UniProtKB/Swiss-Prot annotation:
Purpose of the protein: Heme chaperone required for the biogenesis of c-type cytochromes. Transiently binds heme delivered by CcmC and transfers the heme to apo-cytochromes in a process facilitated by CcmF and CcmH.
Membrane topology note: Single-pass type II membrane protein
GO biological process, one term: cytochrome complex assembly
Name listed for the protein in its UniProt record: Cytochrome c-type biogenesis protein CcmE
UniProt gene name: ccmE
Originating organism: Deinococcus deserti (strain DSM 17065 / CIP 109153 / LMG 22923 / VCD115)
Residues passing through the membrane, by range: 24-44
Coiled coil location: none
Residues that coordinate or bind heme: 137, 141
């Protein structure tokens, strides 16, 4: 059975109605994800920082830095080194405060009294237990030009 042709085409179907979405859940979701990423990236950053301080600064901030890894810089005094056991003990000072330091490991030939040093580690009681020892030195190196200068350099290194 066919329909009689009425001579006109059927009316076009109305466009599908678009559903209007509320942007609030999307904005809240993105904000939550950014907040979580920021917390993961920076939340524990303060705990992992290692501060560089002088002995006097450490003495003033001891309560805040207690139990945290720090780097202490100063001058070396009273060196005792056992090359067989690689045990090194010395005092680091900035002229105001001093701390005893213990370190186990190989020591640079540049390490000596009155030399600048940076030690990295933590305090155990009143003694600083260093895990890393960095000796400061001059950036300039002049090759001895005469035999006398070479002799003087060798004598100073002993």
């Amino acid at each position: 059975m066919t329909r009689p042709d009425s001579g006109s085409s059927p009316a076009p179907l109305s466009e599908a109605r678009r559903r209007k979405r509320n942007p609030l859940p999307t904005v809240l979701g993105i904000t939550a994800l950014l907040g979580l990423a920021g917390f993961i990236a920076f939340g524990n950053l303060n705990k992992s920082l290692e501060y560089f301080v002088t002995p006097t600064e450490y003495q003033q901030q001891a309560a805040q830095l207690k139990g945290r890894p720090v780097r202490i810089g100063g001058l070396v005094k009273a060196v005792k080194y056992n090359p067989q056991s690689l045990e090194l003990s010395f005092t680091v000072t900035d002229g105001g405060a001093s701390f005893p330091v213990r370190y186990r490991g190989a020591v640079s030939d540049l390490f000596k009294e009155n030399q600048g040093v940076v030690v990295r580690g933590e305090f155990e009681g009143q003694t600083f237990q260093a895990r890393e020892l960095i000796v400061k030195h001059s950036e300039q190196y002049d090759v001895p030009k005469t035999q006398a200068e070479l002799r003087d350099l060798l004598e100073q290194s002993e």
